[in-house]
Every structure is written in structure tokens, then in C-alpha cells.
């Protein structure tokens, strides 16, 4: 996609609806509908729809919502459909991109001709992938915090952000506080939570068991594990103390608390892409196959998420990987991720291939995020050298869970569930054949920081040559 930011992926279930952002077109003016994260609509009457830029529409949305200047960097306009998501650059013309949508679908998705013909994007006002988390912590405007909160909540509830149960309960408790008000002892909170459980917890955590025991449990008033944890988290939500007891000010602190908790997730604020990876060979016939994954890319790194199991398969900072993409004729495009690992105690380089028609977009986004990170390093160094500054709202460090609990966390890598190509520099393969690689492959890495990816030298003559 020429000039695009390159953010594409599969939207969550809440976004899987066909809706147009152009409600009526006249000779000169048109009503453009811009959707917010909570599915509310901002109607805009614009002149010269075919030539208006994303920057101009972005400014119009900010004026209608009366957002401060920070919203210019915190949010971006997106074209979103059930098949593809694209973050727009300020210079892009949304109407023209909308007209080109079928071409983009054919280029970057595996959608059928019928699906392409039926698909229609909507214009959405969402978080900018390139907005740093540290800047987000400095925001105090109530409406900006609310919009960020609504988007993060949607990603948690649709499991685009995989979370451990205890984290989901904490986040769900904050949602309860926002939607139901302060917890009041004695109120029928358990019944209310049970009726709206999917409004507070991801759907896969709301499924009840089946069978005889589930039937008996349903007759009583006892809550399930998720419900009880959610209720406890709701009780423990801290209220803001002070003279200002206005509801908006109180909610602002809970929006911020929700976002701070989400900042613990390594893939918060990512762009999402669709792909597939090879499964490890299993069984007598060593059959593998593929599994669908979501590739999440942010300013910090890359995460590969199992769509079915809702957990991370691989998480890498940019300092820990090298990458490339290939698009050979008559073959599937592939994003290659190369990183350090070991094979039965032997240090090796591991190579993961992600099959995706969006490989080109992912590779471009990785390269751009690295450029932004390198450009930001001098600025951060100058800020550190200028002396300590008082933070406007310092947050307490997150409490670390016991080590054994963390090992099973959904955000921990599960490399054993991936089929990788293991090798050393001179091409000696470990159990698999080293594929042909482009000459620029090792050069595409962030090697200026400590702990960077390194090429493993062959040290053991017993390595199997495939």
C-alpha cells in the first residue's frame, strides 16, 4: 500500500459489522460518519469529500469533541472492516482509499471474491500506534482518557489483548466501578455481575461448565470463580479522596488506573495483523499443519499470539530479533523472524516463518518503529541528563506475582508450540534444512542496543547436518 502506515489486521468481534462512513452524498457536501471506540458516531458535514485529507477530518473530529492538542498525536483515523484495518497518514484521502478498498483486500487478504464485493470499511477514530506509552501517562484530559479506556476495554473483552484471569478480574472490577458506580455493601452486586458478565470479562472466561454439576450449581446463589474474583476486585477498587466529588473527576482516575494496568501488557497499543505459522510435527506420521495467529507490532517489539488458545507464542523486543520478508512468485508471502535460542542445550539461531499476505506491511512497520525508537533515544537521554522532574501523577510499581504463577502466564512465550528452523551460521542445520535467505537478512536488525541479537558460531561437530 503506497504511503500507508501499514497497520492491518483482523478487527475484534465488536467491529465485525458492515457500516458505511458516508451516509449521503450531494453535489458538493456529504455527511461523513466517524466511529469512536464505544461505537458512538460523530457526524461531519464536509465539502469536497473526494479530496479532503485525513488531517482535515481529524481536526474536525477534535473540534466536535472539544479535545485538547494532545489528541492530535494520541489518535489517528483508521479505515476498518471485518477483513482489513489501515491506519491513515495525515495526507491520505479517506474517500479515495475507500474507493480502492477492493484492491487492498485482494492484495493484503485471502478474502474470497464474494467477501471482497460485500466488504465496506468504516472510518474510525482510534489510538495512534506510534503514540508512546510514556506520553499517554502524561494525559489528564477526561475525554481523551475515556476514549483510550474504551478502546483498551474493547481489546481486552474481545481477547485481542490476552490477559491472565487475575488481571482480567482487576480490569473487570474497574469496568464495574465505571458502569455501576462505587461498590455498596449489601447491594445485589453478584446478580448484576452474573447477568452482564460478558461486559466485564472476556467471552472465553464467561463460559459456564455443562453437565450435572453445572445444573446443580445453577440452582444456588453461589458465584463461579470468575464471578467471585470479579466481585472481589470490584470491592477493592480505590476511590479518589478530596474535595472534588464530581462523577467525571472520579471516573478519570479509574480510566487512568485501567490504562496503567493495560500498560503491563507487552502488546498494548499494537497494530494487529493476521497470519499462520507451522505447527510442530506430532504423532507417528509427524504431521504438523498450520495454526492461525495474530501478529502484534508496537514501538517496543513483536508478539505472535495464538488465536485459539488466547496466549502468546513468541514475544521479542527489536533488540532481540532480525527480520525480513519474502514474496516469491507463485508462493505465499512470508515474514521471517530470527532470534537466539537453544536446541537441547546447544546455542542456535531460530528462524520462524509467518505466512501472511500482510508480510510486506509487517516488515515495513517493524522498520519504521525501529527508526522512531532510534530517533527518540537522543531526546530521552537529554531529558534524563537535565535532572529529575516531578511526575504529575506517579503510579506505584506493579506488584510482581510469584515466579511459578508467572511461568504459566498467557503473556509468556511458548516457543515449544512453534515449529522453527534451528541452525548455526555456516548452515549446519539442527533437525531441519536451512532455507535460502536474502543477503540483507542479517542486516535488518536493531543492533545498536545492548542485548542485541547475535549470530551463533558452530562449536559442536556433532550437530546434525540436514
Curated annotation (Swiss-Prot):
Residues 391-400 have a biased composition (Pro residues). GO terms for cellular component: centriolar satellite; cytoplasm; cytosol; nucleoplasm; nucleus; plasma membrane. Residues 442-460 have a biased composition (Polar residues). The modification Phosphoserine is found at residues 24, 384, 409, 440, 447. Disruption phenotype: Mutant mice are viable and fertile. It is found in: Cytoplasm, Cytosol; Cell membrane. This is FERM domain-containing protein 8. It comes from Mus musculus.
Amino acid at each position: 500500500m503506497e504511503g500507508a502506515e501499514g497497520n492491518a489486521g483482523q478487527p475484534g468481534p465488536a467491529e465485525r459489522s458492515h457500516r458505511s462512513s458516508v451516509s449521503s452524498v450531494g453535489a458538493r457536501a456529504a455527511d461523513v460518519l466517524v466511529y469512536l471506540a464505544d461505537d458512538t458516531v460523530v457526524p461531519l458535514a464536509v465539502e469536497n469529500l473526494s479530496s479532503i485529507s485525513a488531517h482535515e477530518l481529524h481536526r474536525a473530529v477534535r473540534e466536535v469533541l472539544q479535545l485538547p492538542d494532545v489528541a492530535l498525536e494520541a489518535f489517528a483515523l483508521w479505515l476498518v472492516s471485518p477483513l482489513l484495518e489501515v491506519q491513515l497518514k495525515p495526507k491520505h484521502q479517506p474517500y479515495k482509499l475507500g474507493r480502492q478498498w477492493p484492491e487492498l483486500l485482494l492484495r493484503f487478504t485471502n478474502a474470497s471474491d464474494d467477501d471482497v464485493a460485500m466488504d465496506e470499511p468504516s472510518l474510525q477514530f482510534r489510538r495512534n500506534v506510534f503514540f508512546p506509552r510514556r506520553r499517554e501517562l502524561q494525559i489528564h484530559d477526561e475525554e481523551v482518557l475515556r476514549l483510550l479506556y474504551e478502546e483498551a476495554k474493547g481489546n481486552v473483552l474481545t481477547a485481542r489483548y490476552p490477559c491472565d484471569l487475575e488481571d482480567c478480574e482487576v480490569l473487570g472490577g474497574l469496568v464495574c466501578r465505571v458502569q455501576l458506580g462505587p461498590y455498596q455493601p449489601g447491594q445485589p452486586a453478584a446478580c448484576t455481575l452474573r447477568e452482564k458478565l460478558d461486559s466485564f470479562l472476556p467471552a472465553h472466561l464467561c463460559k459456564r461448565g455443562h453437565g450435572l454439576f453445572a445444573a446443580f450449581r445453577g440452582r444456588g446463589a453461589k458465584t463461579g470463580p470468575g464471578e467471585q474474583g470479579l466481585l472481589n476486585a470490584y470491592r477493592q477498587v480505590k476511590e479518589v479522596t478530596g474535595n472534588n466529588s464530581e462523577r467525571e473527576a472520579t471516573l478519570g482516575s479509574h480510566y487512568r488506573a485501567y490504562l496503567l494496568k493495560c500498560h503491563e501488557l507487552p502488546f498494548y497499543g499494537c497494530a494487529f495483523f493476521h497470519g499462520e505459522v507451522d505447527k510442530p510435527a506430532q504423532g507417528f506420521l509427524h504431521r504438523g499443519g498450520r495454526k492461525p495467529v495474530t501478529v502484534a507490532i508496537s514501538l517496543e517489539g513483536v508478539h505472535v499470539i495464538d488465536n485459539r488458545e488466547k496466549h502468546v507464542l513468541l514475544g521479542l523486543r527489536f533488540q532481540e530479533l532480525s527480520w525480513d520478508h519474502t514474496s516469491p512468485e507463485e508462493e505465499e508471502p512470508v515474514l521471517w523472524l530470527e532470534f537466539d535460542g537453544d536446541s537441547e542445550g546447544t546455542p542456535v539461531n531460530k528462524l520462524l516463518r509467518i505466512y501472511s499476505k500482510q508480510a510486506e506491511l509487517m516488515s515495513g512497520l517493524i522498520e519504521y518503529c525501529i527508526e522512531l525508537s532510534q530517533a527518540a533515544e537522543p531526546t530521552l537521554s537529554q531529558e534524563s541528563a537535565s535532572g529529575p522532574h516531578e511526575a504529575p501523577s506517579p503510579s506505584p510499581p506493579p506488584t510482581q506475582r510469584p515466579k511459578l504463577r508467572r511461568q504459566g502466564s498467557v503473556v509468556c512465550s511458548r516457543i515449544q508450540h512453534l515449529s522453527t528452523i534451528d541452525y548455526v551460521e555456516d548452515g549446519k542445520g539442527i533437525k531441519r534444512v536451512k532455507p535460502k535467505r536474502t543477503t540483507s537478512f542479517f542486516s535488518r536488525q536493531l543492533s545498536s542496543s545492548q542485548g542485541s541479537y547475535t549470530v551463533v558460531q558452530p562449536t559442536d561437530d556433532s550437530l546434525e547436518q540436514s
